[in-house]
Curated annotation (Swiss-Prot):
This is UPF0060 membrane protein MXAN_4406. Belongs to the UPF0060 family. It comes from Myxococcus xanthus (strain DK1622). GO terms for cellular component: plasma membrane. It is found in: Cell inner membrane. SUPFAM superfamilies: Multidrug resistance efflux transporter EmrE (SSF103481). It is a multi-pass membrane protein. PANTHER family: UPF0060 MEMBRANE PROTEIN YNFA.
Amino acid sequence: MNLLYAFGLFVLTAVAEVVGCYLPYLWLRQGKSPLLLVPAAGSLAVFAWLLTLHPTGAARTYAAYGGVYIAVALVWLWLVEGERPTTWDLVGALVAILGMAIIVLGPRR
């Protein structure tokens, strides 16, 4: 699998998970409609399906995916919630992305 394709797939997977978790948050914490649970469930189903498209073992996929998830969550924080990430948020995301790169690009037996 091409590295750019895999990274794009990780980003799509993360967006599906963030949307699937953010919509119930809106209902539970901000008093929005419980009907938001319907698209939330759909988004989480898409998230689970997207995870199956990665070619490596499930545990390695989840570990590598975590780095991208952190970065996408911080972009969401900024663009959707209107809160600019701190320097420490960005440093933490960079460390997570470096960890993801080691997992994805490391040699296999």
